[in-house]
Amino acid sequence: MAADWEEIRRLAADFQRAQFAETVQRLSERNCIEIVSKLVEDKKLDVVHTLDGKEYVTPAQISREIRDELYMHRGRINVVDLQKIINVDLVHVEGRANEIAKSDRGTQLILGQLIDEAYLDRLAEEVNDKLQEAGQVNIAELCKTYDLPGDFLTEALNARLGRVIQGQLDQYNRGMIFTQAFLSRHKACICGLFSGITRPTQINNLLNLYGFQENLVYSMLEELVNSARLKGSVVGGRQDKAIYIPDIYSKAQSTWVESFLKQNGYLEFESLTRLGIPDPINYIKKRFKSSRLLFLKTACVGRTIVDQLEASVEEAINSATWVDLQPMLPSILSEEDVGILLNEVLRSMNVQSSARLLSTSVVSEKFIAGCIALFEDLMQQKAQKEVKNNPVFLITEDDVKQSSALLETSASSKKDKRDERRKKAAEGGGSVKSGGGGNAREIRIRKTKKKGRKEEDSDEETTHSSQGRNKLGDVQFLSVEEIVEVLEEKVCDSSEEMLQELAEQLQRPLSKMYQEVVTTAFLSTSSSGAGGSRKKNMKDLQEEINNLYNNIRLFEKGTKLFSDETQATVAKHVLKTVCTDVTNVLLSFVAAEHMTSDSSAAMTSEIRLKILAKLSDEVRSPLMKLHNSLNGKAIEEFLSCLETSAEECGLFLKKGDKKRERQALSVHRQALCEQLRDAEDPALVLHLTSVLLFQNVTHCMLHAPGRCVPHIIGFLQSKIPEDQHKLLSQYQSLVVKQLVVQGHGAEKKTVPPEGAGGPADSDDTESLQRELHSLSRDIKDTVLAQRKPSVTE
């Protein structure tokens, strides 16, 4: 037996060794990972490895750990914090968190945070504690405190109202929760405050002053007004400019408005606005529906005032006088309102044809007609005087056209002759007068002289004249001030303001009547004028314009001998002097011909434009170009315009031949010599001498300004003897010195210098004068001592 037990113990020891002996064949960690990955890939195993890669976790284990952590964090935890605790990828944590939020009704995923109902209940309890302490809580502030979205928090708290939270949500502003005690206290304050108000008050001011909740104030105020607890009304709804108006004020306001209208007959909109009425016009229309009020810009007027005005206007019309309505008008009315009111009164009375409104006065037409009659004698006297002094400006372009129409028949009979003469002139074979020779050019295309006026029927003439008189508007009868002076003498019972307005109204009809009177006097005077002398005047004019025309051509020839800059200066001078003279002569002739008058006033640029404006288009066009060419720089352009204008006016322009040019040169030289003999001013002596020497050496006439004298002397340097040029240069330097001294003397007279040495300056001036006087005779002799050229030279 002992041997058997020994064998058993030996076998047991071998078995024990076999159990505790390590096996030689086992799986490595790498193989295990590959096996697990293969199983996961084949979807036979659902596990997630940790971030450190040392462990595998099942999704169920992740869910259990999430719920455990949510419980440990009192019902609210961030998903990012869960990822750090569980140590798996954030994607798996978010996925399991979403699964939990979907499967568990008491758990929600809000902005990356898991929140359960237990947390929300505790939050509601905390909010209730704050609410009971303060009486109100602001959900927006709770959102900041608990870092939760407003809609979610509002929904969660609203679900617990009456159960956990003892309060109520504001129906107009769901962002506020109040207790019933707070609402009652607030309502009592609002009721007490508005019960003490006796005038319109802006609700927004009370909100800022007492710190009320805006929505509570409007809702409770509306409730109190509807329940008749407050006697008043809210105007403007729930806007910032809403106003509470107590009934006691509305009653007092209505009483005041009604009383004011009854006593004064008008209501001012601004006064009602100051009373607290925001829309005065609609208020008046509703309050006085049955009253016939006239609404103006700033006020409304009752029938009492309108009836008074109508009675006064009717009396003025019936008595053929005037009436000032200002005393009957409310003083608060603006000028615009006064005009609207008075025009409405005249329109309602239908008396626009019987009376006229002058500011605040109504004047009957009979009174105005009587005032116009006061000026008839003065009008006749002034018309006669105007015809004598200034007949050129009395006839307008319409009169010219009408007068031309009267002569159309007689003019057409001469058309063939003019066309024939025009053709001959173009061929160079026209008639030549006054020794013009073959070089003369006769220009005669259209003649617009108004002959044959007496041959027209007197009735037709009267008809045309009367049609044109109404269009005269250039001759003014009297100024407003002069009319006022006459009215002050004749109308004694009128105020200055009324006379001023009346004069302004009378000025236009008086001027119109005056034009008719002037035209009548003018036509009667011109019809009896001496027509026999017109041919003589025409002949003189023809000769004068031709002489000026040829002189300008000769001046242009002399101008071309200078440089371009000097040519421009001399040309401008010729245009401003001689060319302007011939333009004035031609326009005077046109004015006399087209306006049946031979007289003319001193011509200026303005007068020329005025005359041109009255001419017909066919005559005005070339003459306007002629007038504009005076402001140009080229004499050739002016001559071209002059030829066209003379052609239009029926005048002959003849280019002079050699003989006539020599005659013109001789006459021009003699005239300059006469001026030189009588000249005493050194500057004038130098000017005339230079021009005469220029004509002697070039046989060209020159018409140059004083500032071109140095250029003329420079031109003569190579043309005259050296001693003469030296004398001219010496004399020129003395003249310049004299002009400088005279300029300094004028400055000293204006501003006396301190410590000026008068005697020395006086001696220098006297010495300069003596030297100039001694040389003046020599300068004159350089021209006057030469033999006089003959006319045929």
UniProtKB/Swiss-Prot annotation:
Biased composition (Basic and acidic residues): 767-781
Top-level lineage group: Eukaryota
Pfam families listed in its UniProt record: E3_UFM1_ligase (PF09743), UFL1 (PF23659), UFL1_C (PF25041)
Region (Disordered): 405-472, 745-793
EC id: 2.3.2.-
Keywords carried by this UniProt record: Chromosome, Cytoplasm, DNA damage, DNA repair, Endoplasmic reticulum, Membrane, Nucleus, Transferase, Ubl conjugation pathway
Stretch forming the signal peptide: none
Broadest EC class assigned to this enzyme: transferase
InterPro entries recorded: Ufl1 (IPR018611), Ufl1-like_C (IPR056761), Ufl1_dom (IPR056580), Ufl1_N (IPR056579)
Region: Required for E3 UFM1-protein ligase activity, residue numbers: 2-212
Composition bias type Gly residues, residue spans: 427-439
Keyword set includes Secreted: no
GO molecular function terms listed in the Swiss-Prot or TrEMBL record: UFM1 ligase activity; UFM1 transferase activity
Family assignment from sequence similarity: Belongs to the UFL1 family.
Assembly, per entry: Catalytic component of the UFM1 ribosome E3 ligase (UREL) complex. Interacts with E2-like enzyme UFC1.
Function: E3 protein ligase that mediates ufmylation, the covalent attachment of the ubiquitin-like modifier UFM1 to lysine residues on target proteins, and which plays a key role in various processes, such as ribosome recycling, response to DNA damage, interferon response or reticulophagy (also called ER-phagy). As part of the UREL complex, plays a key role in ribosome recycling by catalyzing mono-ufmylation of RPL26/uL24 subunit of the 60S ribosome.
The protein's name: E3 UFM1-protein ligase 1
Organism (species): Danio rerio (Zebrafish)
